[in-house]
Amino acid sequence: MKVSYHGHSVVQVETETHKIVIDPFINGNDACDLNASTLETDVILLTHAHNDHVGDTFEIAKNNDAFIVAPNELANYLSAQGLNAHPMHIGGSRKFDFGTVKLTQAFHGSSYVAEDGSVIYGGMPAGILLTIDGKTIYHVGDTALFTDLKMYGEMHDIDIAFIPIGDNFTMGPEDAVYAADWINANISVPVHYNTFPVIEQDAKAWANQIKTGKGYAMNIGEVIDL
């Protein structure tokens, strides 16, 4: 299984049978090396409804007839727009043909600004625990620090965790060090930073502070084999 990072919170997972993208914010994400028009994927996972996470979901899903998994209210909205979306809620898990998804708690907001300017309620934000062939990826989503992250680390043997460090909209670097320690993943990767001036951070400096497992600031487009 190959896992790659593409700026902001965009993560791709590729197995022998499936191509999965999480929070595909491509256009408007200057760090991203992907092209929404040509991206090939059959599964899209969304942590919440903010535009910098839903991103190019509509274009990608329509081009690929992709299957979407998202928090309940967001999934219902996407389904109403003609997309193939499966709703889940916090604490729920489900086994799909591509792997098992469990939604975890996240402390954040969730709304989508449509093209006409209307604001769509997106339900509760989430983190995503994705387990495939015995390997577990934890995309923490956008969140503040909260102590249940330690519980998730105790309950699950996490191979790689993607943790926001940008501050202002999510936890900052100091809190994210605590999060990495509690989650206790083999590899902790910083995300949600340097996309906008207000979330500029030194990812390598953050990674060097991680004492539990390995902190690692992935380069854009870099691939890790799990």
From Swiss-Prot:
Pfam family, one: Lactamase_B_2
UniProt keyword annotations, A-Z: Hydrolase
UniProt-listed SMART domains: Lactamase_B
SUPFAM superfamilies given in the database record: Metallo-hydrolase/oxidoreductase
Single annotated GO MF: hydrolase activity
Superkingdom, natural source: Bacteria
NCBIfam families assigned: PRK00685.1
Similarity section: Belongs to the UPF0173 family.
PANTHER family cross-referenced by the UniProt entry: UPF0173 METAL-DEPENDENT HYDROLASE MJ1163, UPF0173 METAL-DEPENDENT HYDROLASE MJ1163-RELATED
Name recorded for this polypeptide: UPF0173 metal-dependent hydrolase OB2186
Lineage: Bacteria, Bacillati, Bacillota, Bacilli, Bacillales
